[in-house]
């Protein structure tokens, strides 16, 4: 995710004063809820789906992930690379 996109997410959240609701637990729950909505896109068929709806739900998941990263003071590249290194062992 680009720095501009990350800043846009932060501004969107700040403008709405949503940070007060963004505890790590609430954000983790929101990620799961949005992931379930993404899964619904494929509920009745593995081959037929609405790509626009998939993009929207995937974006929702990613926005909540970025919010959780911010709340925990983490960097996506850093933790993904750490996990990839662990997985390569």
Per-region residue spans from a language model:
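Flexible "arm" and connector segments at domain edges
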Residues: 1-89
């Amino acid at each position: 995710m680009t720095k501009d996109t990350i800043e846009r997410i932060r501004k969107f959240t700040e403008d709405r004063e949503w940070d007060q609701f963004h505890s790590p637990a609430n954000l983790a729950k929101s990620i799961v809820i949005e992931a379930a909505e993404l899964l619904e896109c494929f509920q009745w068929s593995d081959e037929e789906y609405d790509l626009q709806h998939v993009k929207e739900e995937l974006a929702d998941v990613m926005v909540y992930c970025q919010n959780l990263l911010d709340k925990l003071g983490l960097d996506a590249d850093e933790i993904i690379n750490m996990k990839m290194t662990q997985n390569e062992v």
